[in-house]
Regions:
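Short coil-to-beta-strand
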Residues: 2-11
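Active-site-adjacent alpha-helix immediately C-terminal to a catalytic or transition-state-stabilizing loop
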Residues: 4, 62, 70-75, 144-145, ...
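A conserved hydrophobic position in a structured secondary element of the catalytic/binding core
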Residues: 7, 104, 179
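Short, well-ordered beta-to-alpha junction loops that form the rim of enzyme active sites
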Residues: 10, 55-58, 83, 114, ...
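Loop-to-helix element that buttresses phosphate recognition and phosphoryl-transfer chemistry
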Residues: 11-69, 79, 142-160, 201
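Phosphate-coordination/substrate-recognition cap region in phosphate-metabolizing enzymes
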Residues: 40-131, 137-139, 189-213, 237
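Short, well-ordered strand-loop elements centered on a beta-strand within folded domains, enriched
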Residues: 217-230
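Short, cationic low-complexity segments
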Residues: 229-237
Length: 237
């Protein structure tokens, strides 16, 4: 039996400013750093030893993982995967969510954020927010870099990576993944067999480890958030 731990990065600067972030490489707020350290404290208090670490390519996820490992005093090298990046929000990138609710209506913004296969219009490649213009993504093949994505698109890349690279390692290893709200929602849809309606309602809190207990056949025995006060409804448990 083993543990799979999913951690959404701690609060980022653009989380605080209520902006659509997507692939823009913003860092953690001071509160986000505290959330990451608390995540490490909770993992340590539950006596869970991590064998393998993964994070997305994005600074907020990498720094969350760095702070967790510092608390755990664990110097293992983590594996970085762009497939675990946040969903790309296309032309919405950098815009304020509350302002967009006023401009487009709350239901339309909710559709953009939570529908399964709706993509916002693509982001102009000349934008400084476009991933092709961000140094962190120079290693990614240009034909893999999105202009916009739906949750379905995010699901396909994140879950394909999980199935191809991570899943066969979960039998004998405790694995921690530091990622993002939508890439973690995508993984939860796969792991918990959620339908499209359920996934639209799933909220992932920042910096709160979701611990999934797997049996020897990779079936889920149980799961829980370690920070009970900030836990969200898991829909299926």
């Amino acid at each position: 039996m083993s543990y799979l731990i999913l951690v959404r990065h701690g609060q980022s600067v653009w989380n605080l400013e209520k902006k659509f972030t997507g692939w823009v490489d913003v860092d953690l707020t001071e509160n986000g750093k505290l959330e990451a350290k608390k995540a490490g404290d909770l993992i340590k208090a539950n006596n869970i030893n991590i064998d393998i670490y993964y994070s997305s390519f994005q600074l907020r996820a990498k720094n969350t993982l760095k702070l967790i490992q510092e608390v755990l005093q664990d110097t293992k090298i983590s594996e970085k995967a762009w497939q675990l990046n946040e969903r790309h929000y296309g032309i919405l990138t950098g815009l304020n969510k509350e302002e967009m609710k006023i401009k487009l209506g709350e239901s339309k913004v909710h559709q953009f954020r939570r529908s399964w296969d709706l993509r916002p219009d693509p982001l102009d490649k000349k934008s400084s927010y476009h991933p092709i213009n961000i140094e962190a993504y120079k290693e990614i093949p240009i034909n893999k870099i999105p202009d916009t994505e739906s949750l379905k698109d995010t699901y396909e890349r994140a879950v394909n990576f999980y199935k191809q690279v991570i899943e066969n390692k979960t039998t004998n290893n405790n694995i921690l993944i530091s990622a993002h709200g939508n890439s973690i929602r995508a993984l939860c849809k796969y792991l918990f067999k959620l339908d499209n309606d359920q996934i639209s309602k799933l909220e992932i809190p920042t910096g709160n480890p979701l611990v999934i207990h797997l049996d020897i056949k990779n079936k889920i025995n149980s799961c829980k958030y370690l920070d009970h006060e900030r836990a969200k409804d898991l829909v299926v448990f």
